From Swiss-Prot:
NAD(+) binds at residues 32-36, 81-82, 113, 136, 173, 290, 314. GO terms for biological process: DNA repair; DNA replication. This is DNA ligase. DNA ligase that catalyzes the formation of phosphodiester linkages between 5'-phosphoryl and 3'-hydroxyl groups in double-stranded DNA using NAD as a coenzyme and as the energy source for the reaction. It is essential for DNA replication and repair of damaged DNA. The active site is at residue 115. Belongs to the NAD-dependent DNA ligase family. LigA subfamily.
Length: 671
């Protein structure tokens, strides 16, 4: 694997993790600014190597998957997100792209609004009556929050006025005013309840309560900003006109909406809002800029995950200066050693900040950072800030260098840094308590073995008390042993035991992902499972054979080969199987016996499909003997191009690979 491929893999893994924490768990770990930085870095790398763009890349999707505690609602019209710009130059470039696509030299009329920092929701009215509401979820499927939305007084249960459409789906943001947020936290501190980090987390946590009575006690509000379904009625042909119509029907709309007839007017609006931001009474993180004309919006269309006619112009993350008092080193699941700066506590955006991640040794070297330095930290509404730069002009005399450990700070094992990698790793494996904790947390996670109720704090205690050393030990736990843990009663303990028993029935792909093999994410695990079919075949595969799996290169193949070559890993797998972990036997597909134009072909999907989901398409293609890959190469036999197909289509045309559209794919699927 080339260095850029490894960078892409690590970036995608990190972004997916933080998308899950942000969109699903409502517990983000990093500021929006840091997420945006990672996303920009990923986009830039993918622009350099478009042939390495994969369908599951965070740049190709909208959000994260919904929880299963709520019923699911499928969005008839996908809830897309917006692309971001961060400075005047980027906005002016966006403005020019719009004018170029419209083939116009005249100024576009923009409708400018506030970018609210809450939770995006969809609300469906039928004949003017509220019938359902859902979160964005992954943009295609969200959570049914109808009962909770009904408790928000700002949202009308019945629209009033004339010419209300038979079916109208409005979209907007549920948020918590700062006064309400402060009262919730004040009450929580007094009663010993949960204190929220910021209004956005409080709004999300309030809206996604399983008990609507709790939601009803929270002072949530709502602003409408768009439309999804529109049937049996009409709306004005401008965005501003639609907002005014929504307001006439009783839907709340922000009064901070302005038409701008030039890029300069947009910039003026942006600056004025930024200046007024502290006095608004609720959190925003930028402004949203939309082409006002619906006809021009239709002409501009969409890319895979966002409209071409709108952009979010984000505010710079808020910054403060403080001192680095010390640097500690944390060890992750794969042994990665991450330096963490311990800061002189400082208030940033209303939150007391005392820690900042420093990523790796290269980051420290690039910053020129020393312990004792005065630094600028940046934070954008969430928890972990970043160190932006060192204030060299105010460097104290008593600073000292940051020395990376030569031995693991947890287990004492040697550390290594592979040439070409930025990460320093502990070599201790499962003898390292830190790696053991993180490996076990990964093993039981929702996308892996999905052990309900087995949270991080339980894993921490199990490792610290030496009840559990390997994943197999989890399945030997009894309710009696679990009852001895903090905050774990007999009923909760039995629920965990039951969840562990249920988790034994899994899939081969989930099992592989749960093992935590380096570089093997969900997509790679699924590819390995589909290609080899059985654990025995995978365990005995050579590095060359592993590379025959779509999207598996030399680096991933080597990690997989080395994992199964390690006797201790094979022993743990044997114990897991002995404890009853199992999955359905593979359905053997003899490609020679399949009468399908896709049999034996390596196929790549690109662009948006309108007749079925991408996952459905992959499943149907695989059932007909195709190998579905994530990137175009000389090994690719066929590319299926949906709407807004981009770099993969261009690469296929460059290589002379056969390309068909979605309609032809559907015809051939039925052949």
């Amino acid at each position: 694997m080339e260095p850029i491929e490894q960078q892409l893999t690590e970036l995608r893994t990190t972004l997916r993790h933080h998308e899950y924490l942000y969109h699903v768990m409502d517990a983000p770990e990093i500021p929006d600014a840091e997420y945006d930085r990672l996303m920009r870095e990923l986009r830039e790398l993918e622009a350099q190597r478009p042939d390495l763009i994969t369908p599951d890349s965070p740049t190709q999707r909208v959000g994260a998957a919904p929880l299963t505690a709520f019923n699911q609602i499928r969005h008839e019209v996908p809830m897309l997100s917006l692309d971001n710009v961060f400075d005047e130059e980027s906005f002016l470039a966006f403005n020019k792209r719009v004018q170029d696509r419209l083939k116009s030299t005249e100024n576009v009329i923009w409708c400018c609004e506030l970018k609210l920092d809450g939770l995006a929701v969809s609300i469906l009215y039928e004949n003017g009556v509220l019938v359902s509401a859902a979160t964005r979820g992954d943009g295609t499927t969200g959570e049914d929050i109808t009962s909770n939305v009904r408790t928000i007084r700002a949202i009308p249960l019945k629209l009033h006025g004339d010419n209300i459409p038979a079916r109208l789906e409005v979209r907007g943001e549920v948020f918590l005013p700062q006064a309400g947020f402060e009262k919730i936290n004040e009450d929580a501190r007094r009663t010993g309840g949960k204190v929220f980090a910021n209004p956005r987390n409080a709004a999300a946590g309030s809206l996604r309560q399983l008990d609507p009575r709790i939601t009803a006690k929270r002072p949530l509000t709502f602003f409408c900003y768009g439309v999804g379904i529109l049937e049996g009625g009409e709306l004005p042909d401008t965005h501003l006109g639609r907002l005014l119509q929504f307001k006439a029907w009783g839907l709340p709309v922000s009064d901070r909406v302005t038409l701008c007839d030039s890029p300069q007017a947009v910039l003026d609006f942006y600056r004025n809002v930024e200046k007024d931001r502290p006095t608004l009474g609720f959190d925003i993180d930028g402004v949203v800029i939309k082409v006002n004309s619906l006809a021009l919006q239709e002409q501009l269309g969409f890319v895979a995950r966002a409209p071409r006619w709108a952009v979010a112009f984000k505010f710079p993350a808020q910054e403060q200066m403080t001192f680095v008092r010390d640097v500690e080193f944390q060890v992750g699941r794969t042994g990665a050693i991450t330096p963490v700066a311990r800061l002189e506590p400082v208030q940033v955006a209303g939150v007391l900040v005392s820690n900042a991640t420093l990523h790796n040794a290269d980051e420290i070297e690039q910053l020129g950072l020393r312990i004792g330095d005065k630094v600028v930290i940046r934070r954008a509404g969430d928890v972990i800030p970043q160190v932006v730069n060192v204030v060299l002009s105010e460097r104290p005399e008593e600073t000292r260098p940051i020395v990376f450990p030569t031995h693991c700070p947890v287990c004492g094992s040697d550390v290594e840094r592979v040439e070409g990698e930025a990460v320093t790793r502990c070599t201790g494996g499962l003898i390292c308590g830190a790696q053991r904790k993180e490996s076990l947390k990964h093993f039981v996670s929702r996308r892996a073995m999905d052990v309900d109720g087995m949270g991080d704090k339980i894993i921490d205690q199990l490792v610290e008390r030496e009840y559990v050393h390997t994943p197999a030990d989890l399945f030997r736990l009894t309710a009696g042993k679990l009852t001895g843990l903090d905050r774990m009663g007999p009923k909760s303990a039995q629920n965990v035991v039951n969840a562990l028993e249920k988790a034994k029935a899994t899939t081969f792909a989930r099992f592989l992902y749960a093992l935590g093999i380096r570089e093997v994410g969900e997509a790679t695990a699924a590819g390995l499972a589909a290609y080899f079919g059985t654990l025995e075949a995978l365990q005995t595969a050579t590095i060359d054979e592993l590379q025959k799996v779509p999207d598996v290169g030399i680096v991933v193949a080597t990690h997989v080969f080395n994992f199964f070559a390690e006797e201790s890993n094979r022993d743990v797998i044997g114990q897991l199987l002995a404890e009853g972990v199992h999955w359905p036997a593979p359905v053997v597909i003899n490609v020679q016996e399949i009468d399908s134009p896709f049999a034996g072909k390596t196929v790549v999907l690109t662009g948006s499909l309108s007749q079925m989901s991408r996952d459905d398409a992959k499943a149907r293609l695989a059932a007909l003997g195709a190998k579905v890959a994530g990137s175009v190469s000389k090994k690719t036999d066929l590319v299926i191009a949906g709407e807004a197909a981009g770099s993969k289509l261009a690469k296929a045309q460059e290589l002379g690979i056969t390309v068909i559209d979605e309609a032809e794919m559907i015809r051939l699927l039925g052949a």
